[in-house]
Swiss-Prot record:
Mg(2+) 2 binds at D11, D135. Mg(2+) 1 binds at D11, E49, D71. Binds 1 Mg(2+) ion per subunit. May bind a second metal ion at a regulatory site, or after substrate binding. It comes from Stutzerimonas stutzeri (strain A1501). It holds the Pfam family RNase_H. It comes from the Bacteria. It is found in: Cytoplasm. CDD domains: RNase_HI_prokaryote_like. InterPro entries: RNase_H, RNaseH-like_sf, RNaseH_domain, RNaseH_sf, RNaseHI. This is Ribonuclease H. Keywords: Cytoplasm, Endonuclease, Hydrolase, Magnesium, Metal-binding, Nuclease. The keyword Nuclease applies.
Amino acid sequence: MSDDWVEIYTDGACKGNPGPGGWGALLIYKGVKRELWGGEPDTTNNRMELMAAIRALAELKRPCKVRLVTDSQYVMQGINDWMPNWKKRGWKTASKQPVKNADLWQQLDEQVNRHEVSWQWVRGHTGHPGNEQADLLANRGVVQAKRQPIV
């Protein structure tokens, strides 16, 4: 990977679905690592996967070339297959239903448009160092979320 690229590894976690959830992201640029995490007391795993990518991309101060690595098929399919049609249909599915998590998909779309993003899927929990670190961070977010009041 060229030094011009920012590498981002993201993951989401949820204890119960819905339940307390966390997101984590590892950003690497020119050998410097930055860890981000957070959580919500009542959420879903898919929302946390999306939040990880959104928050990581939003952290970048200027437009960048990004390689974003995720273990989420939901995020990969959404970004590559579903989103173009959702946008054409006014954020509706093929069956004319509102897109689930449209608020986050729209935020992700906004962030992706700021950067040049190359998406890569990796299988989770297979020892990939960046993905494993993102998983640890997401679980840190779950612990944080469990301490937050729901109201």
